[in-house]
């Protein structure tokens, strides 16, 4: 079986060379402009279900912006853990959730497509900045049934955001391992639940 290059394969090769060139260039402050951060988060009770609301700060470098505009997908994971706080024993996990959002540029429509991977809902946005603004707001995400929490116990919730590049082609994934711009992860943002 012979390899016959196709347009996607050639484009992936071009992106690999472009990203490799960016990785081989001397490190600059631009590559690590800011870090991911969870600015605020809370769980709001509505209809017997707790919903997550969070505000994220997601600065990305010019290299990542270029990659997105050339068709490299970006997957953001928002992880949530809810634990029962215990005195003498380790905390026990009550719930955990990983919400994934895919952001990809569609060259045909010249728009950025933001897709909620868990629900399948998607939005079409005109610019990368509009897409990142939308991505930085987690609103009314159902995460936990009220019946799982007892009012006489103490609970803590923790949220973090990170880039998952497991969905990109293998050649790019191997290269991204060495490029700092694609390794972004916030610290855990933790708060005590008010029941």
Cite the ranges covered by each PLM segment:
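Bacterial N-terminal signal peptides that target proteins for export
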Residues: 2-14
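Bacterial N-terminal signal peptides
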Residues: 11-23
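Sec/Tat signal peptide C-region and signal peptidase I cleavage site
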Residues: 25-29
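N-terminal edge beta-strand
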Residues: 31-43
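Short, solvent-exposed beta-strand/turn "edge" segments of beta-rich domains on protein surfaces
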Residues: 42-53, 64-72, 88-92, 147-150
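A beta-strand/beta-hairpin structural motif
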Residues: 52-56, 107, 117-123, 127-149
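Structured domain cores in non-transmembrane regions
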Residues: 66-129
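Glycine-rich, aromatic-bearing surface loops/beta-hairpins
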Residues: 143-195
């Amino acid at each position: 079986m012979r390899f016959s290059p196709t347009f996607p394969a050639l484009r992936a090769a071009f992106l690999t060379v472009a990203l490799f060139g960016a990785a081989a260039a001397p490190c600059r402050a631009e590559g690590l402009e800011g870090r991911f951060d969870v600015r605020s988060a809370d769980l709001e009770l509505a209809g017997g279900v707790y919903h997550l609301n969070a505000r994220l700060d997601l600065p990305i470098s010019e290299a990542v912006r270029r990659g997105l505009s050339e068709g490299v997908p970006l997957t953001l994971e928002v992880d949530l853990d809810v634990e029962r706080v215990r005195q003498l024993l380790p905390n026990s996990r009550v719930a955990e959730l990983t919400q994934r959002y895919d952001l990809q540029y569609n060259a045909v429509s010249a728009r950025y497509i933001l897709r909620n991977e868990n629900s399948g809902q998607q939005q079409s946005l005109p610019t990368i900045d509009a897409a990142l603004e939308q991505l930085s707001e987690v609103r009314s995400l159902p995460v936990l049934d009220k019946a799982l929490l007892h009012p006489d116990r103490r609970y803590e919730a923790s949220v973090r955001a990170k880039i998952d590049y497991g969905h990109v082609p293998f050649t790019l994934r191997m290269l991204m391992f060495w490029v700092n711009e694609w390794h972004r992860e916030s610290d855990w943002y933790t708060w005590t639940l008010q029941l």
